[in-house]
Amino acid sequence: MKKEEYMPGVNRINTYTDSRFSKKVLNQHGAFLIGDEPYEVEIVSKTDAIIRGKNPNFYESVIENFRFYAEHITNFWDESNNLVKTYPAVELVRISIAKIQPSQFYVDEIKKRAVSDFVYTEEDLVIPLVKWENRNVSVDGHTRLFVAAEKGIQNVYGFYTKADDYVRDFAAEAIRRNIVSPYQLIEVKHRDYEKLWFAFCDEYFSGK
C-alpha cells in the first residue's frame, strides 16, 4: 500500500511584493505557499491558467484554493501544456460597469496601483456577481472595477455565483452611502483603508 504523501497547509499570499513570485502572479493573487515552497497560478485567459510549483501532487489543493476567488477559471495547465484539472464551464455575461452595485465602499490606493498594471480592456475583467433586489451586486473585484472605470472601460465580464448574506447587507449599506456603481467608490490611502474598512467589517460581524 502506497504511503500517503504529507502536504502542509496552503497559504495564499496577499501582498504585491514578494521576490519568490512574479509580479504578474502577485497582481492576480495567484501566489501560494505550501510549507516554504512557492506555487503560482497565472491566469492566461478568461477561462485558463498555468500552475507551477515543485510538487505536482499538491497542484489540486492549490487550484481549489485559487478557485475560491476565481471560479470562472476552469482549465488548469502545467508548463508543459498538460491539462492538470478541468471543471465545468462557467457562463460569462457581458455587463455595463454602471449596472454593477458594489458591496464595498473604498479602494486602497496601493492595490489600485497594482491592479492598474493588468487592467487594459474589458477582456481583463471577470467579476463574481449575485442577483439581489434586481441589482447585479459585485462580490469581489471592486478595485478592478474602479480602475476600469477610470480608464474609460464601459463593460466587463461577470458570472453569477453564491454569496453569504453579508454581501447583500454590505450592498445595502453602500446604497445608503450613495455608492450605487463602481464610479462612486472612494479611493483612500492604504492606512485609511485598513482603518475604515476593517472597522466597518469588525463592527458588522461583532453584531452577528
Predicted regions and their residues:
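Short alpha-helix boundary/capping and kink motifs at helix termini
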Residues: K2, Y6-V139, A149
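Basic- and aromatic-enriched surface patches that contact anionic nucleotides/nucleic acids
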Residues: G9, I13-S22, W132-K208
